[in-house]
Regions:
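A generic structural signal for well-ordered alpha-helical segments
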Residues: 77-78, 138, 159, 191
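Catalytic core of membrane glycerolipid acyltransferases/transacylases, capturing the structured
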Residues: 44-68, 79-80, 94-148
C-alpha cells in the first residue's frame, strides 16, 4: 500500500515538474519570438532600405534567411518539450505556380510551414504592416498584404506567372476553440483563376493552444503535438470544366471546408 502511494506521489510530482518546465520554456519562447522580431528589423535593413519589389532573387534570399531562423525557433520549442511536430508529404510543397491552402489552428502555423518551406510567398493580414517587427519581414520577402484590392490580385497573378508558390490561410484568422472551420471563398477563387495546382495542407494539433487572444501562460497539461499533412493536388481545370468560376469556387470552397473539418476531427 505504501509503495503504491509513493508511486502515485512520484508520478504527480513528475507531472508537476513537467508542467513548470514547459511553462518556463513557453515563457522563454515568447521572449525569443519578440527578440527575433526586433533583430529582423535590423538584419533585414539591406532589403528594406533598398526595396525588393519585383526583385525575386533578393526576396528569395530574405525568405531563406527568415525561414532558417523560424526553423531554428521551432526546433527550440521541440527541444524544450513545448511541442512535437510531424510532417507528412512536405516535399510536395513549394512547386512553381502552386497555391497552398492551409487551415489555421494556432499562432505557430506560419512559423512551422515557412520554417520548412521558406521559398513560398504568402498572403498576410494587412494589419501586420502596423507591427514594426513584422513589417520588415513583409517588405523584405515580398509577402502580399491582404487588402482585397485589384492591385493585390495583380500581385497574386504575377507571383504565379513568375513561378513562385503561394501560401494562404483561407480562414482569415485562427480557428476558434470550437474547432469550426469556415473558409473565405476568395482564396479558392484565386486558385481557380491563377494557380497551376491547388494543394491543401491539414494542420492538426492536440491539445489546442496558441489561440487568438489566449494568454501565453495558459499552457495545456501536456506537450502539444502537431501533425501537418499535405493533401492531394487539386487541378483547377477539373473544377472549371463544367461550371463557370463563381459556381466552381463555391463548390470547391464547400469541398475544402468539409475536407479540413473531416481531417481535423
Amino acid at each position: 500500500m505504501l509503495r503504491k502511494t509513493l508511486l502515485v506521489v512520484a508520478e504527480n510530482f513528475m507531472k508537476l515538474l513537467n508542467y513548470y518546465r514547459r511553462f518556463v520554456a513557453t515563457l522563454f519562447g515568447f521572449i525569443l519570438f519578440g527578440v527575433v522580431g526586433v533583430l529582423f528589423k535590423i538584419v533585414l535593413l539591406p532589403y528594406t532600405l533598398n526595396g525588393t519589389q519585383n526583385d525575386i532573387p533578393r526576396q528569395m534570399q530574405a525568405r531563406r534567411l527568415i525561414g532558417r531562423v523560424w526553423k531554428w525557433f521551432a526546433g527550440y520549442l521541440v527541444w524544450s518539450g513545448v511541442l512535437t511536430v510531424r510532417f507528412n508529404g512536405l516535399e510536395k510543397l513549394g512547386r512553381p505556380g502552386q497555391l497552398v491552402l492551409a487551415n489555421h489552428p494556432s499562432l505557430l502555423d506560419v512559423v512551422l510551414l515557412i520554417g520548412h518551406v521558406p521559398q513560398m510567398n504568402c498572403i498576410v493580414k494587412k494589419d501586420l504592416l502596423n507591427n514594426p517587427s513584422m513589417k520588415s519581414q513583409i517588405l523584405a520577402t515580398g509577402y502580399i498584404p491582404n487588402d482585397e484590392s485589384l492591385e493585390m490580385m495583380e500581385e497574386v497573378d504575377a507571383v504565379f506567372k513568375s513561378g513562385q508558390s503561394l501560401l494562404i490561410f483561407p480562414e482569415g484568422t485562427r480557428t476558434g476553440w470550437d474547432g469550426q472551420i469556415k473558409l473565405h471563398r476568395g482564396a479558392v477563387s484565386i486558385g481557380l483563376r491563377s494557380a497551376r495546382v491547388i494543394t491543401p495542407v491539414c494542420i492538426k494539433m492536440n491539445p489546442p493552444n496558441f489561440k487568438k487572444g489566449q494568454p501565453w501562460y495558459k499552457i495545456p497539461p501536456r506537450t502539444i503535438h502537431y501533425e501537418i499533412t499535405v493533401g492531394d493536388d487539386i487541378h483547377p481545370q477539373d473544377w472549371l470544366a463544367e461550371k463557370p468560376l463563381p459556381i466552381a469556387a463555391r463548390r470547391l470552397n464547400i469541398y475544402l471546408q468539409d475536407y479540413f473539418t473531416r481531417e481535423t476531427t
